[in-house]
Amino acid sequence: VNSRVTRFVETLVDRGRGNHALFDVLPPQRRALAEQGLLGSSRRAVVVSLPTSSGKTLIAQFRILQAINQFDHERGWVAYLAPTRTLVNQVARRLRREFEPLGGVVEQVSPALEVDNVEISLLTQRDDEREFRVLVTTPEKLDLMIRQGWETEIGRPLTLVVVDEAHNLQSARRGLKLELLLATINSECENAQFLLLTPFISNAREVARWLGGQNSDDISFSVDWQPNDRVIGIAAPVRGHRIRGCSFDYSVELESVHTTRRTLAIDNPIDIGRNYDLAKTFSKASNTSTVAAITAQALQQRGPVIVMHTQPRWVWSLAEKLQLECNRRNPNGRVQLVQNFLQLEYGDDFPLIGMISYGVGVHHAGLSDDVRMLMEWLFEHGELRFLVAT
């Protein structure tokens, strides 16, 4: 399609034959990119409605590169809108990693409803090698920027707006603000095109035509497809034989109660065993947090595990349970970097410093944005076996 897209495809293949190599796209991606012609520049508005994990982000990456190439002479830029600070951080990290080999600069601005001096410097950068081509932020922050005339201040046209989690248009709390933002961009930013990503939206074609106008083509489609199945199971301790006095042995069983397509339904419960390091008797194993820890310890053999609890203080206690000697590992460069940061910020006694040596991370609203971002970073790079979060 264009040189940037061609180079992007080459970088996907050149990663090597590992978990990160990509040799073919998923069926929904193929339909969007090839059959429906998403890479064409004639469509002003596109709504992509696909289930979670169907590859919407990769579709967006191809469309972003096409938009950058289309307005390369004007040094046009793309706004990628995510609804939460955490998702902004996650998207910015991924886009930087993917676009850095292509020379594309990706920046993010905080959701704070002000443009500080650091962001002013970033937005007004005039060096072709350092100026951003993709800006990741929240809808509220972009709304502030548009109302304050930042497209003019930046001096380069806004060429594409990618809206992640676009079903928020239907939200009673945030939908009206997002709708007004898109309407404002549609009327004031003459070069702007739109790509809306959502796992579900009831009026995708209507939204696409609203943004695209009568003289523009539009495309909206939905595909009931996922690359894998999802299993919902219930883990519970089962009392075994008496071992001494009033104490009983135990095991933890996992019963599948729901799968998305009934492909992984299992008639009998799965015995995931016991863990005497976490609980020696049935009464000790009957605590909900202990059951969660035993289950997570068993499942981590298949890959990293996210364990959720309802309150930060319970998150900490659950994370402490997973500090088992069998989980201890020698900290590598990434882990040591995070530990050094935590020591500088919180002191040597901060419990998270020791936890990550066991492959255990913590993530909740009581931690600073920087710490939460570092936990996500370690988890993405496989440095954490467990991420305990609210």
Task: List where the protein language model places each region.
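Conserved C-terminal RecA-like helicase domain
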Residues: 2-21, 51-54, 70-123, 129, ...
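Conserved nucleotide-binding/hydrolysis micro-motifs of P-loop NTPases
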Residues: 85-88, 113-115, 140-143, 167-168, ...
